[in-house]
């Protein structure tokens, strides 16, 4: 547990933190990042591992080059978050009563049809807007009038948005 602000980094190992109530930066070159509770501003970066986040009520930016991201959010006012993976999947779990605006983007190849791209973003919520062009397939979701912004981006993976 980290009661204030902190920085944790490792060259190749895993990082597991119980709870962070302040701001923190977590980074590893090749391991996984596990965080079970945060209310501050968090940055989590790994080059080759997975990122697992639970009970996150603060802002978070999570980036992985070669892993998956699993995030369970409890969004509060102005707790904007961004999740990016180059070649992994993103799973977001969020309460159906959350006030949040979600933008899910999958980068697609020129030869992919819209119906094929549609299979890459699955959600328990109804999309408010869908945009498909030669590079991107984007679904936007506005829950309960919108609020904090959540961005989900993957270059070659799938995105799932589930009710918690």
Residue ranges of model-derived segments:
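Intrinsically disordered, low-complexity terminal regions
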Residues: 1-164
């Amino acid at each position: 547990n980290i009661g204030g602000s902190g920085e944790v980094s490792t060259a190749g190992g895993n990082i597991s933190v119980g709870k962070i109530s302040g701001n923190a930066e977590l980074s590893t070159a090749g391991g996984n990042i596990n965080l079970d509770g945060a209310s501050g501003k968090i940055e989590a970066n790994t080059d080759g591992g997975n990122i697992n986040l639970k009970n996150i009520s603060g802002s978070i930016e999570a980036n992985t080059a070669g892993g998956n991201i699993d995030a369970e959010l409890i969004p509060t006012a102005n707790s904007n978050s961004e999740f990016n993976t180059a070649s992994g999947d993103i799973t977001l779990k969020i309460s159906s009563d959350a006030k949040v605006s979600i933008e899910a983007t999958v980068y697609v190849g020129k030869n992919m049809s819209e119906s094929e791209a549609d299979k890459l973003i699955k959600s328990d919520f109804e999309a408010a807007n869908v945009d498909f062009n030669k590079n991107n397939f984007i679904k936007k979701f506005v829950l309960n009038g919108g609020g904090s912004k959540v961005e989900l981006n993957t270059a070659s993976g799938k995105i799932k948005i589930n009710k918690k």
